[in-house]
C-alpha cells in the first residue's frame, strides 16, 4: 500500500486493516497498522491493534503493506526526467512503493539546466506527491574525464572554481550525494569547497579510471558510495564487452 501524500499533513489517526505486514523479521499475515501525522503508532497482529473511534480506516483487501522503498539514484521515470518533470516522476515512483527518492542529475546537463532542474525539484518537493523528493543525487558535474560516453559529458577539461561556484550556490543545501571521478585533476579543490558549504555532504566514486591511490587520496572528504565503477573504458583482453554510460 502507498500512502496518500495529499493527506500527509492530517493529524487524525489513520489505520490499515486486513493486510499482510512485511516486517524486518517476517510477515504478519493478518495485520493492522495505525499512524498519526507522520508517526506510526501501532503495528502488529490485527487483534492486538486498537483502532480508535473516528479513525480513517483503509481496508487493504488482503494486500501487502511494506515500508517504503528508498531510492538514492534515479534519473526519472519511463517517460520523464526529474530535471524536467519532477512531479510526474514522483507520481511514477510512489505508485511503485518508493517513499523517499533522490533525483539524479547527470553531467550531460549544463549549468543552466542543472540550476533550473534543481529549482523545479525544490518547488515540487514542497507539496503533494513531491514530498517523496528528499534532495538530489548529483552524478556530476565532474565525472570521468576519459573513457566512454565523452560526447555527453559537458563538464570536461580543467576544474575551475569560477565554473562550479554558481552551481554550489544553488544546490549545495539540496544535494545529498555528489558523484565524482577521483582521477580528475583538481577534483580535491571541488570536494573541499562542497564540504565547506555542507559538512554532511557525501561523495560517491563512479564513472572513473581512478587508481587505488587516487581513491585513497580523496577518502578524507567523505567518500562512502561507489557507482558505475566498471564502465570507464574497454576492458583488456578478448571479451571486451561494450562501452556505455553504465
Regions picked out by a protein language model, each given a short descriptive name:
Residues 60-117:
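Metal-associated gating/positioning segment near the N- to mid-region
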Residues 19, 33, 38, 62, ...:
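Divalent metal-coordination and catalytic microenvironments
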Residues 72-84, 150-157, 202-204:
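Active-site mouth loops of central-metabolism enzymes
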Residues 84-87, 116-121, 160-161, 238-244:
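Charged helix-capping and loop-helix junction motifs
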Amino acid at each position: 500500500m502507498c500512502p496518500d501524500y495529499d493527506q500527509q499533513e492530517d493529524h487524525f489517526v489513520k489505520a490499515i486493516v486486513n493486510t499482510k505486514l512485511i516486517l524486518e523479521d517476517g510477515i504478519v499475515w493478518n495485520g493492522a497498522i495505525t499512524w498519526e501525522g507522520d508517526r506510526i503508532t501501532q503495528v502488529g497482529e490485527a487483534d492486538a491493534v486498537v483502532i480508535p473511534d473516528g479513525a480513517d480506516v483503509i481496508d487493504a483487501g488482503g494486500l501487502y503493506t511494506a515500508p517504503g522503498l528508498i531510492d538514492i539514484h534515479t534519473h526519472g521515470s519511463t517517460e520523464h526526467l526529474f530535471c524536467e518533470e519532477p512531479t510526474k516522476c514522483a507520481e511514477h515512483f510512489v505508485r511503485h512503493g518508493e517513499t523517499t527518492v533522490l533525483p539524479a542529475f547527470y553531467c550531460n546537463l549544463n549549468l543552466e539546466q542543472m540550476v533550473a532542474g534543481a529549482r523545479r525539484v525544490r518547488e515540487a518537493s514542497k507539496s503533494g506527491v513531491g514530498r517523496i523528493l528528499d534532495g538530489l543525487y548529483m552524478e556530476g558535474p565532474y565525472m570521468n574525464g576519459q573513457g566512454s560516453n565523452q560526447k555527453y559529458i559537458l563538464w570536461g577539461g580543467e576544474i575551475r572554481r569560477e565554473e562550479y561556484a554558481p552551481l554550489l550556490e544553488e544546490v549545495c543545501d539540496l544535494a545529498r550525494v555528489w558523484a565524482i571521478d577521483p582521477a580528475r585533476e583538481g577534483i580535491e579543490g571541488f570536494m573541499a569547497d562542497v564540504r565547506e558549504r555542507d559538512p554532511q555532504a557525501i561523495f560517491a566514486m563512479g564513472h572513473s579510471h581512478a587508481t587505488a591511490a587516487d581513491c585513497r587520496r580523496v577518502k578524507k572528504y567523505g567518500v562512502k558510495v561507489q557507482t558505475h565503477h566498471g564502465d570507464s573504458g574497454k576492458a583488456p583482453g578478448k571479451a571486451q564487452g561494450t562501452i556505455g554510460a553504465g
